[in-house]
């Protein structure tokens, strides 16, 4: 019994158990409940009335479409800014790279509402009006670390022999990037897209604070 327990503790997979339990309780189960409530009425009977009510209100549809648009723009900006940052981090010296990664991740330790209020104060200090531009800026500021880290992690683990092979075959830096680096880093890019797009499309607090109802 003791040997089995020691083997269990020494197994790497066992350390993922708390994360799996946490995800199941606070992520999977709430999502399942949302799906259940979407297709049931107050009595628990299956219905599509909830979707009918949604499509009967143009304001709700416009808000939904607008949220998708803001999420797409934010995600694209995060890719354009996050990929070069991740590339610079992955090609920096090890100690400097770790320090810079910590600096990028450090703001994530602060509550998102506090970060957003700080952004509002910054715009107010420079007398910049709140609105759509402020909203996108706040979204990018809050979620760009979620784009940088997965891309950086993928670039760090990338097999550089493919890059060397492309260079030996006469490929220029642009060709090396698009033919070797970008395809190999796509798993990190896709992870970053999911980690930015999903919270951006559903974040209400940032939109409320950075627009002050200036966008209808």
Would you name each region that the model predicts?
Residues 1-9:
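Short, Lys/Arg-rich, polar N-terminal cytosolic tail immediately upstream
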Residues 8-43, 56-156, 182-184, 188-204, ...:
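Membrane-water interface segments at the C-terminal ends of transmembrane alpha-helices
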Residues 166:
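The alpha-helix within a helix-turn-helix
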Residues 169-170, 183:
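Glycine/proline-centered hinge or cleavage motifs at structural transition points of membrane proteins
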């Amino acid at each position: 019994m003791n040997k089995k327990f020691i083997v269990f503790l020494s197994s790497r997979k066992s350390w993922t158990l708390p994360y799996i339990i946490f995800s199941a309780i606070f992520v999977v189960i709430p999502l399942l409940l949302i799906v259940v409530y979407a297709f049931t009425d107050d009595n628990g009977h299956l219905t599509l009335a909830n979707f009918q009510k949604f499509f009967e209100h143009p304001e709700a549809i416009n808000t939904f479409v607008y949220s998708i648009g803001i999420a797409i723009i934010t995600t694209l900006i995060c890719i354009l800014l996050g990929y070069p940052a991740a590339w610079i981090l992955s090609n920096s010296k090890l100690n400097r790279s770790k320090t810079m990664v910590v600096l990028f991740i450090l703001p994530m330790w602060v509550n998102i509402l506090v970060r957003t209020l700080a952004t509002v104060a910054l715009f107010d200090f420079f007398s910049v009006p709140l609105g759509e531009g402020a909203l996108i800026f706040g979204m990018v500021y809050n979620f760009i670390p979620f784009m940088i880290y997965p891309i950086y992690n993928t670039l760090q683990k990338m097999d550089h022999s493919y890059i060397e092979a492309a260079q030996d075959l006469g490929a220029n830096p642009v060709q090396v990037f698009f033919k070797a680096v970008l395809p190999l880093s796509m798993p990190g890019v896709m992870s970053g897209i999911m980690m930015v797009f999903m919270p951006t499309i559903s974040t209400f607090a940032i939109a409320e604070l950075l627009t002050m109802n200036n966008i209808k």
